[in-house]
């Protein structure tokens, strides 16, 4: 190689170092000896990618639901597009190793963590996962503290942005709207008839999500009694007392199935094959409604501003506290059998990794990358 100092060789000829990052094979020319020192080496290039820490309030995973699933999926999507993301916990690194923090939820208990992150000088992106449509919410002070600590607030719809600015103190340039994303697996067709074969069904009405009082599954069960098409619930429950009430009110036509892995073939099959997809809670529908729209399912939804912005006028909307209207809407959807009205729009606007790339572009502006 020629005579050069140990320091020179360390930065040139022998630029091979141990690392857990991705390895790449390349030809490297010694900066001290030119072409006389060309060698083929495995070099672990210095990782210049963003590194993000994802956090939430500490009680979140005591009773995990859709929000916790979304947090896990967000970490996966971020890593898939080339940015390193870790969930906060025993296996995450020191805070100083991260360029920014994405905090999920404005639930009480997260403020102390965010205060420490802010004091360390790390940019905070907040995804509130808060029901801005509830004008009687008692946690407004807690939410305001989260908003104050954030450098960037990501909301899902323009109607949520308007409500946030109406009811809280926040600068317009601190808020951005990023459409909710659908797991890319939902874009794949499932084996035809898989769900029906597994559960002995033909036509059926589907509702995916946690059983909870504010979701109004009990009222739906009562409204659809005698409709003669099975009503299938997929998901766990938050309140066993309410779940037991639903089971007691359910006749033979109602099926309660356990939680299914997001984007799994059995869940995709359930959505792609159902006669009607139903979701009638007091709050905005969950991500499952977007997944059902991508699958082409006819849908009956609670008449909610979030739904109107997401789906326009192509779905059937109904007041969730009106049993007669619920039954009439479901009957209409069953008779119409119109499918695939929103499939292409959902694919282009909501299918991941598009929304995650949008989020990261906004975040990079905040951290100067």
Which residues fall in each region the model found?
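Nucleotide-activated donor-binding/catalytic signature segment of Leloir-type glycosyltransferases, i.e.
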Residues: 235, 243-262
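Conserved acidic donor-binding segment of nucleotide-sugar-dependent glycosyltransferases
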Residues: 6, 315-323, 331-337
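Conserved donor-binding/catalytic core segment of Leloir-type glycosyltransferases
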Residues: 1, 196-215, 221-232
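Short glycine-rich donor-binding/catalytic loop of glycosyltransferases
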Residues: 282, 297, 301-311, 320-321
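Acidic anion/phosphate-binding donor-loop and adjacent secondary structure
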Residues: 137, 165-166, 181-197, 203
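A charged, aromatic-enriched C-terminal amphipathic alpha-helix characteristic of glycosyltransferases
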Residues: 1-21, 66, 334-368
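Acidic donor-binding loop of glycosyltransferase active sites
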Residues: 269-284, 297
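Helix-loop-beta element that forms the nucleotide-linked donor phosphate-binding surface
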Residues: 161-182
